[in-house]
């Protein structure tokens, strides 16, 4: 009798676990199908809910208005542009360093050796920060600087 009870309990637990796993799988698939705009709205929804709770009906109608949604989308677009501009600014720094090193090598300019090593190391590490290696290039494990020190 105890064995039958144990098997029945195991069967119930297995059915429950299977049902929970199916619900989890459906939630994951639903998350993968959603559009980026909908995901952005879901990220902001806790903040919207907080404002609704704090400022009652007036805030709720404002948050649902088309003007708010338009402004919200504009802010998100501006944030994406800021990230892109930061990325391009770092690339411009690398170009300036490369130009300075070129002038040092061919323009007979004197530049501090330690500064040149630090700039070379910065220029070396920047592509790995943004993952902008060409297809045929892989990142080396170390770099030898002018002083022969391995980093």
From Swiss-Prot:
Known Pfam families for this protein? Gliadin
- Residues bearing PTM Pyrrolidone carboxylic acid: 20
Per the record, its GO cellular-component terms are: aleurone grain; vacuole
Q: Where in the cell is it found?
A: Vacuole, Aleurone grain
**Out of the domains of life, which is the source?**
Eukaryota
GO molecular function terms noted in the UniProt entry: nutrient reservoir activity
Q: Which InterPro entries match?
A: Bifun_inhib/LTP/seed_sf, Bifunc_inhib/LTP/seed_store, Glia_glutenin
Record keywords, A-Z: Pyrrolidone carboxylic acid, Seed storage protein, Signal, Storage protein, Vacuole
Signal peptide bounds:
1-19
Q: Provide the function of this protein.
A: Seed storage protein; serves as a source of nitrogen, carbon and sulfur for the young developing seedling.
Which family does this protein fall into? Belongs to the prolamin family.
The name under which this protein is listed is Prolamin PPROL 14P
The organism encoding this protein is Oryza sativa subsp. japonica (Rice)
| Encoding gene, per UniProt annotation | PROLM20
């Amino acid at each position: 009798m105890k064995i039958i009870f144990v098997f029945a309990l195991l069967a119930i637990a297995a059915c429950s676990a299977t049902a929970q796993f199916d619900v989890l799988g459906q939630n994951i698939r639903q998350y993968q199908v959603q559009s980026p705009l909908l995901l952005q709205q879901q990220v902001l929804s806790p903040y919207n809910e907080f404002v609704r709770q704090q400022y009652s009906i007036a805030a709720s109608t404002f948050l649902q208005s088309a003007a708010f949604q338009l402004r919200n989308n504009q802010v998100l677009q501006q944030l994406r542009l800021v990230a892109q501009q930061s990325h391009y600014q770092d690339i411009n720094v690398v170009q300036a360093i490369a130009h300075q090193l070129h002038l040092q090598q061919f323009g007979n300019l004197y530049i501090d050796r330690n500064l040149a090593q630090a700039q070379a190391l910065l220029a070396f590490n920047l592509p790995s920060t943004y993952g902008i290696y060409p297809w045929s290039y892989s990142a080396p494990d170390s770099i030898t600087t002018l002083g022969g020190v391995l980093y």
